From Swiss-Prot:
Residues 1-27 have a biased composition (Low complexity). It is found in: Virion. This is Structural DNA-binding protein p10. Belongs to the asfivirus P10 family. It comes from the Viruses. The lineage of its organism: Viruses, Varidnaviria, Bamfordvirae, Nucleocytoviricota, Pokkesviricetes. Keywords: DNA-binding, Early protein, Virion.
C-alpha cells in the first residue's frame, strides 16, 4: 500500500503536464487569444492543413515555415 501511494505521487508528478493543461488553460487561452482568436490552441498540423486548404505555401526558401509564420499567413488570407 505505501509503495502504491509512492508510485501514485510520482505518477502525479509525471501527469502534471497533462493535468496542468486544464489548470493553466486560463493563462494559456489568455496568451493565445491575443495572437489568434480563431483557435485557442492550434497545433502545427492543423495550421498546415488550413494553409494547404487555402493554397498557402508551407515551405519557403526550401524550409518549412514556423508555427507563428504560418499563423500570420493564415490570418492574412482569412
Amino acid at each position: 500500500m505505501p509503495t502504491k501511494a509512492g508510485t501514485k505521487s510520482t505518477a502525479n508528478k509525471k501527469t502534471t503536464k497533462g493535468s496542468s493543461k486544464s489548470g493553466s488553460s486560463r493563462g494559456h487561452t489568455g496568451k493565445t487569444h491575443a495572437s489568434s482568436s480563431m483557435h485557442s490552441g492550434m497545433l502545427y498540423k492543423d495550421m498546415v492543413n488550413i494553409a494547404r486548404s487555402r493554397g498557402i505555401p508551407i515551405y519557403q526558401n526550401g524550409s518549412r515555415l514556423t508555427k507563428s509564420e504560418l499563423e500570420k499567413k493564415i490570418k492574412r488570407s482569412k
